[in-house]
Amino acid sequence: MIINKTKDLMKVQPNILSLIGNTPLIRLEKVVAGFDGSFFTKLESFNPGHSNKDRIALHIIEEAEKKGVLSDGYTVIETTSGNTGFSLAMVSLVKGYNCILAVSSKSSKDKIEMLNAMGAKVYVCPSDVSADDPRSYYQVAKKLHSEVENSVYINQYF
């Protein structure tokens, strides 16, 4: 069954964040043949950052705004090894926040360049150190949070 959503797709959105979460639900048929029940999947790759992490980043930032811990002129700080960093950088950029990300040296050059292109300041930290080492991306993010006035440390891993 093909559903024509051209009218909805052509609707002007206030910004890219309004597209987060509006991902299609697809009925699975062939892959689940022989199983009882109905099976569906969400195409999270249809989010602007091509990941379900867009939902998470938007939710975290909006909750911080509601609680009053994040407002104009503030900086979002996080450790990341993947899509969460991109999503936080994107949401921060659109909402006007600064974004600082601490990443492992295992991160690809392309990923680091993409984070920079999204407006994030990226600190590349050695990957061959323990999590409690002051040079680890966990500790670097904590230190930056203590040094950067008006910052919020997301702390997704703990």
Locate predicted features.
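PLP-dependent amino-acid enzyme catalytic core
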Residues: 1-158
